[in-house]
From Swiss-Prot:
Binds 1 FMN per subunit. This is Dihydroorotate dehydrogenase B (NAD(+)), catalytic subunit. Substrate binds at K44, N68, S69, V70, G71, L72, N124, N189, T190. It comes from Caldicellulosiruptor saccharolyticus (strain ATCC 43494 / DSM 8903 / Tp8T 6331). Its cofactor is FMN. Pfam families: DHO_dh. NCBIfam families: PRK07259.1, pyrD_sub1_fam. The lineage of its organism: Bacteria, Bacillati, Bacillota, Bacillota incertae sedis, Caldicellulosiruptorales. The active site is at C127.
């Protein structure tokens, strides 16, 4: 069965990608599974300088998922290039660098450093814009356009723009990214959420709110992938609560070219193998010759 997909000329041997933030830089998981099983690995979020992240507690379990407010803890781009990237290049899989900036200039600088070293870059626009009162870049179509264009102007590899679901109309963000030259979009990022300890009356997350991931957000993610698929022609990487192959199939039918799996990696490190096998069995059972035939193939 042909599971190969292509995003802006980059061929992935299968459409299952390790999502940013749940896989670190692959070192821990490499002791449990062959991480070459993934079609690609999307790195933990990378910033220009080292970040220690937010204060603890910054992770809590809730019905149907996890709320996190890790705060982009990472060693910084220089340490990533010198220490983590050589390790990742030892595996037979594509590497996607997830970049995070707090100004347009930081996104541009990160792209200049990384675009010749990795297969693709995923631009996380859920960072606060420190020059404009902390508003999240990705909520404003004009900012999405501006940053995407600035990054594309200096990039030597394909650019994936990661979209936030915490907006009224995500398709408008997708359109802005496409107009600015994005090679693909990925969605959805986490959904803004909160949980409270009723005994202490304190939020379970030190920063009060965080991002919800896991199966609770899957129906939202599927809807948003479908809405974007109807509006743009560039490939969509779908994510949000994928726990098994059936969840993955929904995303392909809704219009995703590839998928990312995140929260499930915490629960089942072997999920990538099980999801791949399930997709293959489904395609054979339904008479498809390749995964590409399923993308956007919805009966309405």
């Amino acid at each position: 069965m042909n599971l190969e997909v292509e995003i802006a000329g980059v061929k992935l041997k299968n459409p299952v990608i390790a999502a940013s933030g749940t896989f670190g830089f692959g070192r821990e998981y490499s002791k449990l599974i062959d991480i070459s099983e993934f079609g690609a690995i999307c790195t933990k979020g990378i910033t220009l300088k080292k970040r220690n992240g937010n204060p603890q507690p910054r992770l809590c379990e809730v019905y149907g998922g996890i709320i996190n407010s890790v705060g982009l803890e990472n060693p910084g781009v220089e340490a990533f290039v010198n220490e983590e990237l050589p390790f990742l290049k030892g595996f037979n899989t594509k590497i996607i660098a997830n970049i995070n900036g707090f100004t347009k200039e930081e996104f541009v600088e990160l792209t200049k450093v990384l675009s010749s070293l990795v297969d693709m870059i995923e631009v996380n626009l859920s960072c606060p814009n420190v020059k404009e009162g902390g508003m999240v870049f990705g909520k404003d179509p004009e900012k999405v356009y501006e940053i995407t264009k600035s990054v594309k102007d200096v990039a030597s590899c394909p650019i994936i723009v990661k979209l936030t679901p915490n907006v009224t109309d995500i398709a408008q963000l997708a359109i802005a990214a496409e107009k600015a030259g994005a090679d693909a979009i990925s969605l959805i990022n986490t959904v803004s959420a909160m949980a409270i300890d009723i005994e202490t009356r304190k939020p379970l997350i030190k920063m009060v709110t965080g991002g919800l991931s896991g199966p609770a957000i899957k129906p939202i993610a599927v809807r948003m992938v479908y809405e974007c698929f109807k509006k743009v022609r560039i490939p969509i990487v779908g994510m949000g609560g994928i726990m098994n192959y059936k969840d993955a199939i929904e995303f392909f039918i809704a219009g995703a070219t590839a998928i990312q799996i995140g929260t499930v990696n915490f629960i089942n490190p072997k999920a990538v193998c099980e999801i791949k096998e399930g997709i293959e069995a489904y395609l054979e059972r339904k008479g498809f010759n390749s995964i590409k035939e399923l993308v956007g193939n919805i009966n309405i």
